[in-house]
């Protein structure tokens, strides 16, 4: 199973009952002993778009109110407004009988919109001065051993040799501009929304 399939499995929601879901969070998407905020946002977006008639959040806001433990929690979806072109609602994440996080979103049907897609932009000139094979593979443990979450380590990151800061010697000119030119890749193809 590739990373995209694993993530889809990690945010999978089943059988809503009265607009409520019980979620057993996947610890592969934790920072320490608590779920990563982006992971929670993805689950809450999924809950909202599972209940509302529109499939994509076009505007959203998340409030992280209290710590979430590594145990099951409840998502409760409340509809605010439903019309032909958009709908909105709120998702409340509850654990230990208190609201820990809220996600408010307005949704629409972007898959029916027409317009530009996959616009190509040329790479900056710095990508032309070295071949990709010369780029330095990110060593997550050398940077912060044991700190980088597992879900970040799934990312294959190759950094331009001039920007691999962990390999610089003490004679490096620290007055240079901060830059990080890199290739970021993940197995599994183009992600969904």
For each of these PLM feature ranges, what is it?
Residues 1-193:
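Terminal targeting signals and extreme-terminal segments of soluble enzymes
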């Amino acid at each position: 199973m590739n990373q995209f399939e694993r993530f889809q499995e990690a945010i999978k929601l089943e059988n809503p009952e009265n607009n409520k879901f019980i979620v057993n969070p996947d610890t592969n998407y934790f920072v320490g002993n608590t779920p990563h905020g982006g992971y929670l946002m993805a689950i809450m977006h999924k809950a909202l778009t599972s209940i509302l008639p529109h499939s994509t959040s076009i505007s959203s806001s998340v409030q992280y109110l209290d710590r979430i433990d590594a145990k099951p929690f409840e998502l409760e979806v409340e509809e605010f407004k439903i019309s032909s072109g958009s709908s909105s609602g709120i998702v409340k994440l509850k654990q230990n009988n208190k609201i820990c996080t809220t996600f408010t979103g307005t949704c629409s049907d972007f898959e029916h919109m027409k317009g530009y897609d996959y616009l190509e932009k040329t790479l900056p000139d710095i990508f032309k001065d070295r071949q990709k094979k010369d780029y330095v593979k990110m060593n997550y443990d050398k940077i912060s051993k044991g700190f980088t979450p597992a879900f970040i380590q799934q990312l294959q990151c190759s950094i331009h040799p001039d920007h691999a800061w962990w390999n610089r010697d003490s004679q490096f000119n620290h007055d240079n501009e901060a830059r990080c030119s890199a290739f970021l890749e993940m197995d599994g193809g183009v992600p969904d929304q």
